[in-house]
Amino acid sequence: MEIQLALDLVNIPEAIELVKEVEQYIDVVEIGTPVVINEGLRAVKEIKEAFPQLKVLADLKIMDAGGYEIMKASEAGADIITVLGATDDATIKGAVEEAKKQKKKILVDMINVKDIESRAKEIDALGVDYICVHTGYDLQAEGKNSFEELTTIKNTVKNAKTAIAGGIKLDTLPEVIQQKPDLVIVGGGITSAADKAETASKMKQLIAQG
């Protein structure tokens, strides 16, 4: 089980400083969609150069032109790139094909997919690397989370690894760990903490205990 730190509301220098605080406790750094919008793929390049030992995920949320966008993110140094589960199979296939060429990984984000079980089955057959249940900011504000959806994909997905994102904090992490996802994605649960390093360290300890 790995920890991914999601960075959304920072610029590149702030991102570098933040990762420095927690780098020994995390496995993947996510360059979130807002950062990509504000800074471009340069953010991926600079974080990968600053922390070559960490995997970098580019949260592009690809909906079309899968092959091309995977190629551009790969050139910037991304190790993992996101595609939306709500897109069509042709886009996912194009993304998977290009990712294999570039020796990169695809994470499919199931945000706003209505029938998680049936869509996860379809996507799992397309050769993606991760399938991720995700409660976005707007639904988190309504008190929702993806813990039940994680159970669904754990029971459904046979080939891809599983991931969960959205609203995970130190006090809710044990519930997530019980489901044994392969990747736990934490944003504000670390970035909003008074002591980011201590929080990330405790999360790593909890995960190690399983």
Describe the function of each predicted region:
Residues I31-T33, T162-I168, I185-I190:
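Glycine-rich beta-strand-to-loop/alpha-helix junction loops that act as flexible
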Residues L18, D64-A76, K114-L126, T156-K158, ...:
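Catalytic cores of alpha/beta
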Residues E23-D27, A50-L54, E75-I80, K100-K105, ...:
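Glycine-enriched alpha-helix->loop->beta-strand junction motifs that scaffold or abut catalytic
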Residues I37-K61, A95-N112, K144-L170, S201-G210:
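Alpha-helix-loop-beta-strand connector modules within alpha/beta enzyme cores
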Residues R119-T151, A160, T199:
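Glycine/Thr-rich beta-alpha phosphate-binding loop at enzyme active sites
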Residues M1-G67, E75, I116, I123-A125, ...:
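Conserved N-terminal beta1-alpha1 strand-loop-helix module at the mouth
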Residues D8, V28-V36, K55-M63, D79-A90, ...:
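Catalytic beta/alpha-barrel core
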Residues A78-A90, I131-A141, Q179-M203:
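Glycine-rich phosphate-binding active-site loops on the catalytic face of alpha/beta enzymes
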